[in-house]
């Protein structure tokens, strides 16, 4: 029985070519997904450069600017430029994934 379990264990290890480095199947999947996302991201950056000005702005800064301006209009701070700059810096992570 133990020899069967050892054989099963060895079979599982043999299925994962990177097991000798301690990489599990889930880690390998994560790495592959990251590679694919990086390739898509680099293709997207090239696409952004080829867009007309209006389309480029609509896809990059208009969404966060509209949200920031809406908050600015609602709160009406005494220093609106600094408020908007601060808002953009604080919330840019929410919108960077969309680009």
From Swiss-Prot:
Modified residues (Phosphoserine): 19
Gene Ontology biological process terms in this record: endosomal transport; transcription initiation-coupled chromatin remodeling
GO molecular function term, any single one: protein homodimerization activity
Pfam family, one: Dpy-30
Alphabetically ordered keywords of this record: Acetylation, Chromatin regulator, Golgi apparatus, Isopeptide bond, Nucleus, Phosphoprotein, Transcription, Transcription regulation, Ubl conjugation
Cross-link (Glycyl lysine isopeptide (Lys-Gly) (interchain with G-Cter in SUMO2)): 35
Gene Ontology CC, one term: nucleus
Region (Disordered) residue spans: 1-26
Signal peptide, first to last residue: none
Subcellular location: Nucleus; Golgi apparatus, trans-Golgi network
Top-level lineage group: Eukaryota
Transmembrane region(s): none
Modified positions (N-acetylmethionine) in chain numbering: 1
Residues the record lists as N6-acetyllysine modifications: 35
Family named by the database record: Belongs to the dpy-30 family.
Assembly notes: Homodimer. Core component of several methyltransferase-containing complexes including MLL1/MLL, MLL2/3 (also named ASCOM complex) and MLL4/WBP7. Each complex is at least composed of ASH2L, RBBP5, WDR5, DPY30, one or more specific histone methyltransferases (KMT2A/MLL1, KMT2D/MLL2, KMT2C/MLL3 and KMT2B/MLL4), and the facultative components MEN1, HCFC1, HCFC2, NCOA6, KDM6A, PAXIP1/PTIP, PAGR1 and alpha- and beta-tubulin. Interacts with ASH2L; the interaction is direct. Interacts with ARFGEF1.
Function of the molecule: As part of the MLL1/MLL complex, involved in the methylation of histone H3 at 'Lys-4', particularly trimethylation. Histone H3 'Lys-4' methylation represents a specific tag for epigenetic transcriptional activation. May play some role in histone H3 acetylation. In embryonic stem cells, may play a crucial role in retinoic acid-induced differentiation along the neural lineage, regulating gene induction and H3 'Lys-4' methylation at key developmental loci. May also play an indirect or direct role in endosomal transport.
Name of the protein in its database record: Protein dpy-30 homolog
Organism: Rattus norvegicus (Rat)
Gene: Dpy30
